[in-house]
Amino acid sequence: MSDHAEHAADAADTDAPEGDDAGGDDGEQAGDDGTSALSERVRALDADNADALADDVAALEARVETLTDELADAEDEVADLTERVQTKQADFKNYKERAKRKQEEIRERATEDLVERLLDVRDNLDRALDQEESESDEDGIREGVELTRDEFDRVLETEGVTEIRPEPGDSVDAARHEVMMRVDSDQPAGTIVDVYRPGYEMSGRVVRAAQVTVSEE
């Protein structure tokens, strides 16, 4: 081989590695650029997802707040309705109790009115007995009148009617005694001397006050 040919071969060997190094650098640069672009896209997607997630969370929080307000309003309405129902129930209960008391009062008043009228009949029986004491009793009239009066008294007792007949010397009770007159007496001044007509009470209520005479003061 000539000197010129050897020189050309050496030159070719020397230039070949330099060409390979340049190609490698270009490949590495292209790879770095691709990775950077991918990273940017990932970061952009993450940002978009974060924004969307934040919007979803905000919407959910607003919905929760709205539902909480609606629940509070519903609870207030339920409480108000419950209170109104309880008030109505209490009013109805009170009405029933008042109606029951009214019925009882009407019944008692009707019974009292009847008893008061019947007491006049009993007074007549007493008067008949007083008259019979001074007359003959050949026909047994007195006994019949006494039996009638006794039966009458049993009926009154069954209805809860009791007699008001104060004793001499008792104090005057304005609610149960009616003073007919004042007389001279050995009883203490202002006390009862005698009973002119007995009174009656029914279930603790005075149907007719006893008529009495009172010692003068």
Curated annotation (Swiss-Prot):
Region spans: Disordered: 1-39
Keywords: Chaperone, Cytoplasm, Stress response
A GO MF label: unfolded protein binding
Pfam families: GrpE (PF01025)
PROSITE patterns found in the cross-reference section: GRPE
GO terms classed as biological process: protein folding
Keyword Chaperone: yes
Superkingdom, natural source: Archaea
Disulfide-bonded cysteines: none
Gene Ontology cellular component annotations, sorted alphabetically: cytoplasm
Ranges of Basic and acidic residues composition bias in the record: 1-10
Locations listed in the record: Cytoplasm
Keyword Zinc: no
Biased composition (Acidic residues): 12-31
Main localization category: cytoplasm
Alphabetical list of PANTHER family matching this protein: GRPE PROTEIN, GRPE PROTEIN HOMOLOG, MITOCHONDRIAL
Family to which the UniProt record says this protein belongs: Belongs to the GrpE family.
Assembly description: Homodimer.
Function as written in the Swiss-Prot or TrEMBL entry: Participates actively in the response to hyperosmotic and heat shock by preventing the aggregation of stress-denatured proteins, in association with DnaK and GrpE. It is the nucleotide exchange factor for DnaK and may function as a thermosensor. Unfolded proteins bind initially to DnaJ; upon interaction with the DnaJ-bound protein, DnaK hydrolyzes its bound ATP, resulting in the formation of a stable complex. GrpE releases ADP from DnaK; ATP binding to DnaK triggers the release of the substrate protein, thus completing the reaction cycle.
HAMAP family given in the database record: GrpE
Protein name, entry field: Protein GrpE
Organism ancestry: Archaea, Methanobacteriati, Methanobacteriota, Stenosarchaea group, Halobacteria
